């Protein structure tokens, strides 16, 4: 018989840098997860993606065992990396802080495709372009 899921915990953690300190420790402690076991396994799985923020969905079972799924980094993080900026615009409608090319948007959309609710790459690109515009980026050809 399959294990019964007791709790689901969603976190965004820097790749390879999960520690028992807040915010990871308290979130996992409340769910009753072995914190050191999770941090070691997460850091081992994400060591090759250093510098990225990785969303993770942790399923906690009744016997306090767990497993987790790592997702692709958020579109905003990938866009900031592609544009080479620290943060987006505080007023995106009036102040543009950077620009990204359609080729960069396509590359990000292809990376994000497994996690996006998009039927094809063009609709995924439109989602990424919308995120870019809301961050104060211009999309150029």
Swiss-Prot record:
UniProtKB keywords: Methylation, Ribonucleoprotein, Ribosomal protein, RNA-binding, rRNA-binding
Which biological process annotations from GO are given for this protein?
A: translation
Alphabetically, the GO molecular function entries are: large ribosomal subunit rRNA binding; structural constituent of ribosome
Quote the Pfam families the UniProt record gives: Ribosomal_L11, Ribosomal_L11_N
Q: How is it modified after translation?
A: One or more lysine residues are methylated.
Output the InterPro entries linked to this UniProt entry. Ribosomal_uL11 (IPR000911), Ribosomal_uL11_bac-typ (IPR006519), Ribosomal_uL11_C (IPR020783), Ribosomal_uL11_C_sf (IPR036769), Ribosomal_uL11_CS (IPR020785), Ribosomal_uL11_N (IPR020784), Ribosomal_uL11_N_sf (IPR036796)
> Which cellular component, as a GO term, is one annotated location?
cytosolic large ribosomal subunit
Q: Which cysteines are joined by disulfide bonds?
A: none
Extract the PANTHER family matched here.
Answer: 60S RIBOSOMAL PROTEIN L12, LARGE RIBOSOMAL SUBUNIT PROTEIN UL11M
Reported function: Forms part of the ribosomal stalk which helps the ribosome interact with GTP-bound translation factors.
Assembly and oligomerization: Part of the ribosomal stalk of the 50S ribosomal subunit. Interacts with L10 and the large rRNA to form the base of the stalk. L10 forms an elongated spine to which L12 dimers bind in a sequential fashion forming a multimeric L10(L12)X complex.
Q: Which family does it belong to?
A: Belongs to the universal ribosomal protein uL11 family.
Q: Report the protein name in the record.
A: Large ribosomal subunit protein uL11
């Amino acid at each position: 018989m399959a294990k019964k899921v007791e709790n689901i915990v969603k976190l965004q953690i820097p790749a390879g840098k999960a520690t028992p300190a807040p915010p990871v420790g308290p979130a996992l402690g409340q769910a009753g997860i072995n914190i050191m076991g999770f941090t070691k396994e997460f850091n081992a799985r994400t060591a090759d993606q250093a510098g990225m923020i990785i969303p993770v969905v942790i399923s906690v079972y009744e016997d306090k065992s767990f497993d987790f799924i790592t997702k692709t980094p958020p579109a905003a993080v990938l866009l900031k990396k592609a544009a080479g900026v620290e943060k987006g615009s505080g007023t995106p409608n009036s102040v543009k802080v950077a620009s990204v090319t359609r080729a960069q948007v396509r590359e990000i959309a292809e990376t994000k495709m497994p996690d996006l609710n998009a039927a094809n790459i063009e609709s995924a690109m439109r989602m990424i372009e919308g995120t870019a515009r809301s961050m104060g980026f211009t999309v150029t050809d």
